[in-house]
């Protein structure tokens, strides 16, 4: 029999901090894995919504309500109080998201985003905090995307540890076709019901799923999918893949393996490391069959198994060939050796696709802002370079960030000389400018080695 927890709002009414309530819920979820939470909706308070408002970025795009954070703040307390009143009466109805399209990195395709109205952003953020307190205790160690205290770099560290120290011989790559657009709403609600029995919370989540999309002035219903762009989307996506993929991998597929197998997932992007060839070769078909049950498909052209690891590197050297490579989280991973040549190492460099996309995006940005004052351009460009180094400046990828730095210099020189009626630069004058207003030099600041035993 599944036990139910009826959280009482009394503690919160008596002044118990919101964070304490969420921590207590997380502790219960961690201790009692089959517990269903019956009373969570009382947490949708002014305190929580005000905190969500403070966390909201001021430069976020507006939804169909066209209300900005600055405008909402003009009468903040009254606005939030009235919002809470509608929530408690369960009279709150989300508005359709505003559909926009952004370029997909490294591709001519566009990625659809759904921009919620301002109050929808607040309510989504509050629901995400509540759901996260429960499901963060359930998610497996191999899941890294959109989770507190975890990052892409943590996923890459786990990958290095697995490939270099756990005998990986094969990598299985898979791509879920249009994951966010194909989430089945009925399955989503059934998955949430495993842990949540508060009908008001479930009803509000369902309303967001069904809120619709406005595009070119027309509203259409959303019968499936989770719009990318809302703060509740990442936690819902993680819940869906937790049940559809992660638990199946841990409890079914891996238990049937002859060798070791490990899943490393960041949102809907994932890699499987395996030691046994037979296990590796059966993975794509079994994955496709599993995902089909939940309305998802694998992209056949992006799903493959390759030999990769210590043995793969040795086999390739024996036949004077290069070992296979694979891309994950913006990096191309390849087989190599330590500097002294004595030990196998997996190394990584910025993937060609991501590199080209980053250079193209920077080119468009420089073209657009080239008429700004030179000092303004140099300051903003410095921030962009630092952001690039913070992500791509990882162990073994100095040449990747250095190459990007040199491409940036060439683009900057080109576009500073395309400003009408402005001073043109010779290369010597441009070098003088860089000495006066220096750009941050390429650096590796993220080390992807584990010191000591890794736990997941």
Name each region found by the language model.
Residues 1-456:
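Non-catalytic terminal/accessory segments
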